[in-house]
Each structure stands twice: as C-alpha cells, then as structure tokens.
Amino acid sequence: MAETKEQTDDVETLMASLDQLGMEADPTSKEFNNDDSKIGAPSEVQDEKELLEFLDQLENDEEKNEKNPIEEANEENESVAATSNERQQHDASNQPSQAAQTTINKNTESATPKTVNEINKSQEFQEHVETPKQSNWLGGFWSTASAAVRSAEQRVRSIKGFEENANWDINVRNMVDLNKLGDLSNGIRSKALPTLSNTIHNVLNVVAPPIHDHEVLQVTVFHDLAGFAHLDRIVYESFEKVMFQVEGGELTVLLDKEAKVRPRTNDVYEDFGLCNGYLEAKKLAKANLAEPITEAKKMNKENKQENVGAGDDEDASESPMVRVTHLLLVIQAFTIKNKEVSDDEQLCFLIHLNDTNHNLEFSTTSQPLPLEWQRWAVDPRYIKLFGSNAILPNEWVTEWVEQSISVAAGIVAQMYTSKRMALGDPSLFAGLPEEDVNTGSSETPVPYYDGAMYA
C-alpha cells in the first residue's frame, strides 16, 4: 500500500508540473513522447495528459495571435522561471522520486532552448523591421553627400581654370617683352599710321586735290663712312618728323647705288674719309654731288617735257599730276681744332642738301665729338681687357655718331621745309591788314644761318 501511495503522489506531482509547462512544451515533439514512455504511467494518466496538452495548445494559439513575439518571449521566460522556483520548493518539501525529477529536468531543458530560439527570432524580426528605416536614412544622407561632393568638384575645376589662366598670363608676359611691344606700338603709331593716313588722304584728294599737294620728295644719301649701314634710315626718320608740319606730300629716302658699307679699320682718317676744316669739307661735298646733280637736272627736263605733252590728257581726265622732287644729301666728315672749346681734335659731320628742281642748297654741321673716341672704338685691346660680353667703347661711340648725324639731318630738313613754305619772306604778310603787320616787316629780312662753323 505504501508503494501504491508513493506512486499516486508522484503522478499528482507530475500532473501539476505538466499544467504549468503546457504552454512551453510541444505536444507533438518526439522528446516529450519519449520522456512519457520512460516514466511508465498508466493509460488513464496518459489520456488525461493528452487532454490537458490539447487544451494548452488551444490557449497558446489564441495568445500567439494577440501578442507580439517579444511579449510572448518575456512571458515564456517568466513562466519558466516560476516553474523552476515552484519545482525547487516542491522537491524540497516532498522529496519526489528520481524518475519524476529526471522527467521535469528534461522537460525544462527541452523548453529553455526553444525559448531562447524564439527570443532570437523576435530580435531578428525587430531588426528586420528597423532595417528599412535605417536604409532610408542612409540613402538620404548618401545622396546629400554626393551632391555636396559634385558641387565641390565643380568649384575646384573653376578655381583650377582660373589658376591655369593666371599661369598662362604669367607665361605669356615672361615670353613677350612688354618694352619691345611698346616700341612696336610706337613704331606703328609713328610710321605705319602716318603712311596709312597719307595714303587715304591721297586717295581722297583725287576727287578734290589741293595745290602743291601731289609731290614726292625723293632723297638720295651719299657718304663714305665705314661701319655705318643704317644712315639712310636715320635720314628718313629725321625728314619724317619735319614732314609732319606740311600737309600732303610723300617722302622716300634712297641710298646711293655706288655707296658700299665698308668694315672699319684701325685708321680713323680712312674709315671716315676725313678732311681738315669746314671749307675743305664743303668743297669735297659739292664735288661729290657734281655728277649726281647733272643727272638729276637731266631727269627734270625729261619730266617737264612729258608733263607738257600730257597737258591735254590731264584736262580731259582731270587727274592731278604727281611731281617728283630730287633731293641730294651728302654726309662728309671733317676735323676741327677750336681752342676755345678744347685743345683736342674734334670730329664733325657736314650735311649738305641740294634741291635740283628748285635750285636750293642748305648746309649744316653736327655736334663736335672727340676724335679720340673713334680710336677707342677700333682698339682691340679693350675687348681683351673687358671681355666680349661687356659694353665696349665701339657700341656707345657708334650710338653718339648716329645721334649727331640724325640731329644735323633734321636741321637741314627743317631749313629746307621752311624755305619751301616761304617763312621769313615779307611777301607772305602782304594780304594781312596794316595794323597786324609788324613795324619791322618793311626792313630787309635777316638771312638764314647756314649752320657753318668758321674758324
């Protein structure tokens, strides 16, 4: 009887524990069936247990439909903890059998991993729900960052373009000499523009030509100076400055065909063809121009005959006649000794101009230069002393010689132009009222100073 009573108590204890573990255990699992088969309870107890499990399963299905996975997992954890506490208290008071204790432990162990798995699934479900929100936030942040990067790249490209333009501008300024550009612009302004304006002016004057406006001044330069190859250009620039004072007319400067540029030697007298004194230089200049003057006068006669024969054609066509005036200019070097200025010998240049068309002659002299400079210019010892890269005397001596000739040629050009304009002639003021005429105008005019230096 005692054994039967103990078995009955064990069965009641088992039924109480099954009521509490019904929500956790799976009624269809093989482990639960295997544990029950190991206990060896009667068939009635087995039927009652199956009925209770069926009822518990229905309750679990209803609760799962109403609760979320997180709450269900929390309740299962609480139920597992409560069941374990009650079982420990019951085992301590009643001391259940080894078989019942083994069954409870197995059921608890089988239920606990399942509860942990459900908790993990619930966490995965929550992460899956939160993932779209995070992905949307990350997508918006990424698009904003991409737009900022693109705008920054465009700004960098624009700044880089400005830097490249600045560098290009610096490189161009380094490659091109601005001083040379300034000289070029001045040359265009002083040479090309006047020539162009004169050309346009001549074209317009074909319709209504002014008097004495269609005239070409053809200057031929003669000299015997060694080492000076640009004297024709110097004479042209000097005459051009003076020609700006006169409306109309054209200017051409030619170099004598027989004039040859000779290299300089150590003999200064030979290099410059020096003669002694102004009078000897003037005689030599006129002698050198004797033959060219004869040829020029011959050409003038031929041109006059052609102009007379073409008079009728001119009236028919009403086209102006272009006159060519031949000017012969000779440059002659000579030496002087002026004790009032210096005891050393001085170098001067005589500039003599002859107009064969109007029978006009003008002469002047240049600024005296120390003749010793010319000896320095041809002395090779200065090259050995200072080196070829230094500024040697021949460079600045040549520059001073060209400047002195340029000034003298300009003075001769101004004298010639003033004479052609009848400046200083009393008849020029004949048409003015008497009150505007100077009282000294009736006097004889002062003769021109020819620029000669007399010893």
Curated annotation (Swiss-Prot):
It holds the Pfam family DUF5427. Residues 1-113, 296-317 are annotated as: Disordered. The keyword DNA repair does not apply. Coiled coil: none annotated. Residues 27-38, 296-305 have a biased composition (Basic and acidic residues). GO terms for cellular component: Golgi apparatus. The keyword Flavoprotein does not apply. It is found in: Cytoplasm. Keywords: Cytoplasm. It comes from the Eukaryota. Residues 80-113 have a biased composition (Polar residues). Belongs to the MTC1 family. Involved in telomere capping. This is Maintenance of telomere capping protein 1. It comes from Schizosaccharomyces pombe (strain 972 / ATCC 24843) (Fission yeast).
